[in-house]
Amino acid sequence: MARSTCRRTNVIVPEEGKVMKKIAVLFPGIGYHADKPLLYYSKKLVMNKGYKIADVKYGVLPSGVKGNPEKMLEAFKLALKYATKQLQEIDFRSYDEILFISKSVGTAVAAAFADENHINARHIYFTPVPESFAYIKQPGIVFHGTADPWADTELIKTECRKRNLPLYITENANHSMETGDVVNDLLIMKGIIENVSSFL
């Protein structure tokens, strides 16, 4: 897995004796839910590191969004509406550290939600779609596979460079960060979670 240097940003050092209050919010993709590997293992990792978890669940979203900008925008707006409704009771100001973990279209939802609600979050962006970069402004790390049919690798590289986002590229991995070789996919997942752990 190719990678660039990962830098820690916006990390708050607690006063001596104070336990940091941390929350992680999971923003899934349209068909990639929190029980699938990238989000499942990320969730377990951050739980072990003391984060409270909030799982966003979307309602019905449009199908056939791939390659259809209008449907993609419609899906994004609906997903953002669902997320906003579910997260409105959380007082993010009460947390010392806020982490948004997102997948695919969820990367746009997470970025837009943070921006609209003035939430200072760090992000883990799994396989963002090109449209996501219109909303991505905050620091984080990005994961992308070169066989992802939803996003061109050169475009992802360019957009990450513009925003100074560390980008982890896996050769021949698809939109789920898998290659079809089960043993290799397990090794890929291990590397991804290790990189996520280093970012935290």
Regions found by a protein language model. Give the residues of each.
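Gly/Ala-rich beta-loop-alpha elbow adjacent to hydrolase catalytic centers
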Residues: 101-110
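A conserved short beta-strand
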Residues: 119-129
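Short beta-strand/loop motif that positions the catalytic acidic residue
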Residues: 142-144, 148
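Conserved alpha/beta-hydrolase "acid-adjacent" motif
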Residues: 149-155
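Catalytic histidine-centered segment of alpha/beta-hydrolase-like enzymes
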Residues: 173-187
